[in-house]
């Protein structure tokens, strides 16, 4: 990855939306690159970017695509406000500006190599951790067994369903476990909430865990992992929803002595234990 200066991160890059994929009824994935077709910038798994539309607004989004993909950068966006509603209304060819990469990243090189990895996601929370999975699959020989546990309200709400159910399991030593909250017609897979499903799967406690999802899911999944014998220093999460300006200047991401924009968004849970209970 080439060196990116702080000045580079401050300057918005013009991006063109090349393709839009309808993932679920309220989530779309936008594939964006520069006007000349080149990448907007390099990034690492877990980093974020600020997308702006002049006259509409700007927002912070995780980058769910792998850094090894040099054709385009992906953003999976749930419709939940003015900017996201506008983005859901556009067609390919729309110009946006993108500023990044912002924040730290998952330690895929320094800490994860050679280890068995458990990735846990819920709802749109699968987007920030997808980049980790994609990166590890692109460098499969560097990592041990990969397990992905992902849950959503219904089959229709499972983001990246085709990719996760058909493509990832074809990669050696890679296992995907999908669940939905309630029974529904046409679904013959597991039914139940992610925290309970993780406990049922009863994974060995030598895994490194990466987790992202709704706060209530994270709370009970972490408790379940502790019951199984995992330690908090084994579990990583991302707090990109707390990021605002992206450079630690506005102060709205501050938690105790940390600024999520600068010190995060990726943290281990033992690091979060040292902060005020504001997250």
Locate the predicted segments by residue.
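FNR/FR-type flavoprotein reductase catalytic core
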Residues: 3, 82-244
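Structural signal for conserved beta-strand scaffold positions within catalytic alpha/beta enzyme cores
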Residues: 19, 65, 178-180, 237, ...
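Short microdomains enriched in Cys/His and/or Lys/Arg
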Residues: 120, 267-279
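Local cysteine-cluster metal-coordination motifs and their immediate loop/turn environment
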Residues: 216, 240-265
């Amino acid at each position: 990855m080439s060196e990116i200066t702080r000045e580079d991160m401050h300057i918005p890059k013009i991006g063109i939306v090349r393709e839009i994929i309808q993932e679920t009824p309220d989530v779309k994935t936008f594939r964006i690159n520069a006007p000349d077709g080149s990448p907007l910038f390099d990034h690492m798994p877990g980093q974020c970017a600020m997308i702006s539309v002049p006259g509409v607004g700007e927002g912070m989004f995780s980058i769910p695509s792998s850094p090894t993909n040099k054709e385009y950068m992906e953003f999976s966006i749930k419709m939940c406000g003015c900017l996201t509603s506008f983005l859901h209304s556009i067609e390919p060819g729309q110009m946006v500006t993108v500023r990044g990469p912002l924040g730290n990243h998952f330690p895929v090189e320094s800490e994860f190599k050679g280890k068995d990895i458990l990735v846990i996601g819920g709802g749109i929370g699968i987007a920030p951790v997808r980049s980790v999975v994609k990166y590890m699959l692109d460098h499969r020989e560097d990592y041990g067994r990969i397990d992905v546990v992902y849950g959503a309200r219904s089959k229709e709400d499972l983001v990246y369903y085709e990719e996760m159910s058909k493509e990832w399991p074809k990669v050696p030593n890679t296992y995907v476990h999908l669940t939905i909250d309630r029974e529904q017609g046409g679904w013959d897979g597991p039914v139940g909430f992610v925290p309970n499903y993780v406990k049922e799967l009863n994974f060995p406690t030598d895994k490194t865990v990466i987790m992202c999802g709704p706060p209530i899911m994270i709370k009970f999944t972490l408790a379940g992992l502790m019951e199984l014998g995992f330690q908090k220093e084994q579990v990583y999460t991302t707090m990109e929803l707390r990021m605002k300006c992206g450079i630690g200047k506005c102060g709205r991401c501050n938690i105790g002595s940390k600024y999520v924009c600068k010190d995060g968004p990726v943290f281990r849970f033992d690091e979060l234990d040292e902060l005020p209970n504001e997250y």
